[in-house]
Amino acid sequence: MTDLVDIRGLTRSFGGPAILDGIDLTIAAGEFVALLGRSGSGKSTLLRVLAGLDDAPARQLRLPQRRSVVFQEPRLMPWKTVVDNVTLGVKRRDARSIATQALEDVGLSHRQNAWPLTLSGGEAQRAALARALVREPELLLLDEPFAALDALTRLRMHGLVFDLWQKHRPAVLLVTHDVGEAITLADRILVLDGGRFTKEIRVSLDHPRRRSDPEATRIEAELLTELGVEPLHA
């Protein structure tokens, strides 16, 4: 696979110790990468750099042109219908038809003319995913998009995101605090701590993945230990 993202020596600070301390990162086309780390470890800062929302010096910073971000909050415009939110900023003549297809992909075609304030949390996040997909991103950036959802909705969203990734095949970077979520979805898991990557694990388990799988259990224990959490089954 070709490296879609290639970053060398990326550094970011805000007047104190470096949040990102000369890190190197590659993400291949179509690869699903999960990024774990404690609060304040720089995960969201890195995602913002990848999204072009923050500048940071680097020896090399190669990013694809087509990038989309889904944040923890859906950030829908309440005065626009769902479909108008999805097409916001899209200049193509066929924007409406592409948005309709994207809403169908996320299971929300029946709510395309609804107002955002009438959506459930899961529906609003589906709309945010459709808005990201309509731009046909080469790189999809997910900044803890399931954190505010209840447990059952989170599980459903995991399945949806995996299916969308399989269909559209963007490279994905998922920022999360949830080790199980990372193991369920990602090809590769990175741990960020002290401004550097301290752990990299490739996950070769077949999908659908089960947390009870011995290899998943081993990876979970290794990641929790790296994050300073004692595994419950240890």
Where are these regions (language model features)?
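Helix-to-loop junction immediately C-terminal to a conserved catalytic motif
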Residues: 51
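The feature captures the beta-strand-to-loop junction immediately N-terminal to the Walker
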Residues: 36-38
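A short, proline-enriched helix->beta-strand linker immediately N-terminal to the Walker B motif
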Residues: 134-138
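Conserved structural motif at the start of ABC-family nucleotide-binding domains
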Residues: 5, 20-22
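Hydrophobic anchor residue at the start of the ABC signature
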Residues: 129
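Catalytic Walker B motif of ABC-type/P-loop ATPase nucleotide-binding domains
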Residues: 140-143
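Conserved ABC ATPase signature
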Residues: 115-119, 123
